[in-house]
């Protein structure tokens, strides 16, 4: 096989997830170039192999191949575009550890790449420069470079392997800085790119994770659940990808929000095994399980270990919620104030909404409903603008509590009804339970939705799932799902207990 064909084979194998074949092809091409006395081309093969290993999380072999490529360039002393890749590999590990001081390294690499008119190296240097600028706090400049990177990617100016890497890194970066608009736009672009190449494995798995995160926020939880499961299957390999932990974490998040608590715990545990810290999801799960004694130390441990300010923003809202549940209002105030301080440094509607909600919740706990109300309304408007129905419903619940505290029972009822309607549509079982606990009532049967109340009545009448499905014109699978929700909401485990609940609460006469 010709050496150029070996290089094409290596890239194709990488794109379809055949890592062993990819490595073998790069190594073979590397050896051919060495035998031909072309160390620069041999070094390039070493760098491409290292790039795939680096983004799969195999850092030790990646460093080994970079060292070999660097030695070849040093021996040849050639002025070539491969020198740009060597410079970037020197800075890459430090950049991904959060060190912004490597920015000049990527400027130098970009200059070399531009001089040789190498589109791949130029794009990658620009991506790393944008990342470094954002780490320096120069977010506007950094995101400008990121947009430029994505223009070259969507215009098909770079190789497929680097295009996929750029998509995933840019979306991850947008999510890290809470730039939801860009994250949504580039996720949709990644979906289209993956759909046009159905054989992709690494990028399709990452694409599913990113898409799942967007769908979760938008409230499309059933589709998000399916995508999360597919992402776990795709990324599990062999070989397993380093983003497998994120896929399991995302699966756990959706299961937790739907009240599938046992399944969520298993998913969080699998995320941990795959290398992803399951916080704050695990702490919020413990809270939903009524295990405040486990939730408090877990979220505190996560905060103690996390120094990065943006990463702390992912933990602080959960900390506020858990601390308020534990009646530690002073500590919740400290966490909310820290969140507000960080959010003030970033132009992010998402962060502003998190801050307004958390601060409003603390003010409510402090007994200042009048001050809490405008913050909670601001949060609710932001969540609506962001098309985040679950977050909006949670804000409306607190708005209702604030209105009630101010003596406006009619407005409180409107907010409670709006919140419950949205939560029922989402299937947010734990939040429906919380709503019933906080308000002392609901529209149908305690925390149950109208359809769940209908199913409960038929269960109390002694009817089987098949008969219930026929009477309500729904599938037996849907009946089973409603029963699972009923058991979770009412904290029961059998049809007999469900029947007893129906009689005890006057639903059956």
Predicted features by range, described:
Residues 1-28, 32-36, 41-45, 105, ...:
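Extended alpha-helical scaffolding segments used for macromolecular assembly and cargo binding
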Residues 1-2, 6, 19, 36-39, ...:
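Inter-repeat boundary and helix-capping residues of tandem alpha-helical solenoids
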Residues 7-19, 43-59, 82-99, 121-139, ...:
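Tandem amphipathic alpha-helical repeat scaffolds
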Residues 22, 45, 125, 130, ...:
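Hydrophobic packing within well-folded, soluble alpha/beta domains
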Residues 27-38, 51, 67-75, 107-118, ...:
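Amphipathic alpha-helical segments of tetratricopeptide repeats
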Residues 260, 266, 291-292, 322-330, ...:
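N-terminal regulatory/sensing modules of transcriptional regulators
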Residues 365, 374, 437-493, 497-509:
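Helix-turn-helix DNA-binding segment
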């Amino acid at each position: 096989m010709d050496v150029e064909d070996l290089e094409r084979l290596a890239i194709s194998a990488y794109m379809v997830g055949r890592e062993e074949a990819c490595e073998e092809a790069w190594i073979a091409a590397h050896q051919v170039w060495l035998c031909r006395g072309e160390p620069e081309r041999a070094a390039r093969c070493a760098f491409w192999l290292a790039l795939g290993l680096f983004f799969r999380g195999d850092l030790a072999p990646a460093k080994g191949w970079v060292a070999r490529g660097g030695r070849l360039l040093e021996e040849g002393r050639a002025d070539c575009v491969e020198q740009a890749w060597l410079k970037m590999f020197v800075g890459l590990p430090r950049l991904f550890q959060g060190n912004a001081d490597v920015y000049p390294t990527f400027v130098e690499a970009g200059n070399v790449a531009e001089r040789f008119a190498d589109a791949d190296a130029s794009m990658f240097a620009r991506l790393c420069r944008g990342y470094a600028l954002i780490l320096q706090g120069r977010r506007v400049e950094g995101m400008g470079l990121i947009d430029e990177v994505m223009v070259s990617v969507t215009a098909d100016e770079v190789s497929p392997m680097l295009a996929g890497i750029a998509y995933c890194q840019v979306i991850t970066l947008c999510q890290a800085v809470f730039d939801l608009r860009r994250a949504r736009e580039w996720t949709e672009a990644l979906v289209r790119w993956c759909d046009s190449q159905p054989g992709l494995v690494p990028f399709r798995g990452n694409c599913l994770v990113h898409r799942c995160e967007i769908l979760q926020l938008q409230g499309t939880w059933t589709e998000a659940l399916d995508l999360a499961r597919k992402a776990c299957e795709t990324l599990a390999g062999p070989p397993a990808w380093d983003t497998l932990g994120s896929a399991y974490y995302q699966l756990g998040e959706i299961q937790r929000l739907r009240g599938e608590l046992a399944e969520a715990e298993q998913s969080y545990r699998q995320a941990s095994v795959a290398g992803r810290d399951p916080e704050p999801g695990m702490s919020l799960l413990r809270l939903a399980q009524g295990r405040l004694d486990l939730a408090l130390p877990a979220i505190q441990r996560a905060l103690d270990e996390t120094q990065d300010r943006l990463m702390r923003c992912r933990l602080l809202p959960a900390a506020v919620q858990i601390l308020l549940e534990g009646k530690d209002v002073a500590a919740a105030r400290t966490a909310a104030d820290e969140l507000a301080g960080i959010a003030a440094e970033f132009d992010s509607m998402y962060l502003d909404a998190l801050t307004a909600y958390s601060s409003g919740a603390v003010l409510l706990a402090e007994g200042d409903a009048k001050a809490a109300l405008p913050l909670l309304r601001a949060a609710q408007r932001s969540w609506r603008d962001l098309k985040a129905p679950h977050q909006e419903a949670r804000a409306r619940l607190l708005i209702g509590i604030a209105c009630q505290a101010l003596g406006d029972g009619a407005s409180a009822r409107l907010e409670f009804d709006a919140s419950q309607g949205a939560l029922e549509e989402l299937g947010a079982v734990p939040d429906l339970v919380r709503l019933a606990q906080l308000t002392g009532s609901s529209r149908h049967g305690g925390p149950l939705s109208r359809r769940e109340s209908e199913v409960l009545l038929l269960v109390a009448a002694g009817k089987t799932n098949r008969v219930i499905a026929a009477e309500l014109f729904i599938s037996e699978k849907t009946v089973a799902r409603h029963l699972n929700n009923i058991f979770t909401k009412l904290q029961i485990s059998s049809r007999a207990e469900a029947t007893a609940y129906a009689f005890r609460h006057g639903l059956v006469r």
